[in-house]
Every structure is written in structure tokens, then in C-alpha cells.
């Protein structure tokens, strides 16, 4: 029984997703339905959490919009998520960056990860 469920879940999982980690700045293209038409809306921010659960994986992106912090959680393999683009890699030493919620301005910056030679 569980083999059937596992096979169905693997069939629905997206394979074209880039590798990203907490601290990375990403642009998530989200499908937004307005009336009878559909368009793409970009949500750019820092990944503060990733939850790896196969088909039920999710990640949280945080951005500052008009001086107000906005967080949005996306299901990784959802049909609403059109694409994910990694803008820059962040060098962090935590899996969950919830401490960024209390910080603003320069203290909320994340160092850029340098490429290995």
C-alpha cells in the first residue's frame, strides 16, 4: 500500500527545482488568478526556513515591503509555484532564521557565500 502512495507522490513532485538553502535570496514566481485570467507574481526575499517532507515540502520566504516584514510559506511542489530562481547565496550557520524577525536594517543583512575554487 505505501509503495503505491510513494509512487503517486514521486509522480507529482517537481524535478526542475534549483537547490537552495536558508539564507539564500530567491524569486518565487507565483500563479495568481484574477477573475478569468491568470498571471505571474514575483515574490523576492530571503529563505528563512525549509521543511523537507517529500511531496509535502515547504519553505518560508521573508521580505520587507513598505517597511513592514512580510513572510509567505510556499509548498515546494505546489502547482501555484511556477518557478524558483536563486538570486544570491547566503552564508548562515542556522537551519531556521527566525531571529531575522526581530531585526531590521543593517543587522538583518546576511553575508554572501563565496564560491569555492
Curated annotation (Swiss-Prot):
Q: Which superkingdom? A: Bacteria
Q: What biological-process GO terms show up in the record?
A: translation
Q: Which Pfam families match?
A: Ribosomal_L19
Annotated Gene Ontology MF terms?
Answer: structural constituent of ribosome
Family, according to the entry, reads as follows: Belongs to the bacterial ribosomal protein bL19 family.
Q: Function of this protein?
A: This protein is located at the 30S-50S ribosomal subunit interface and may play a role in the structure and function of the aminoacyl-tRNA binding site.
Q: What is this protein called?
A: Large ribosomal subunit protein bL19
Q: Which gene encodes it?
A: rplS
Amino acid at each position: 500500500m505505501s509503495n503505491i502512495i510513494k509512487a503517486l507522490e514521486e509522480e507529482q513532485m517537481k524535478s526542475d527545482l534549483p537547490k537552495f538553502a536558508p539564507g539564500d535570496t530567491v524569486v518565487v514566481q507565483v500563479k495568481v488568478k484574477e477573475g478569468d485570467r491568470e498571471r505571474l507574481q514575483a515574490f523576492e526575499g530571503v529563505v528563512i526556513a525549509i521543511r523537507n517532507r517529500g511531496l509535502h515540502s515547504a519553505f518560508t520566504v521573508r521580505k520587507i515591503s513598505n517597511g513592514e516584514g512580510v513572510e509567505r510559506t510556499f509548498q515546494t511542489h505546489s502547482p501555484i509555484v511556477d518557478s524558483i530562481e536563486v538570486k544570491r547565496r547566503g552564508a548562515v550557520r542556522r537551519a531556521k532564521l527566525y531571529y531575522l524577525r526581530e531585526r531590521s536594517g543593517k543587522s538583518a543583512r546576511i553575508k554572501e557565500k563565496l564560491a569555492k575554487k
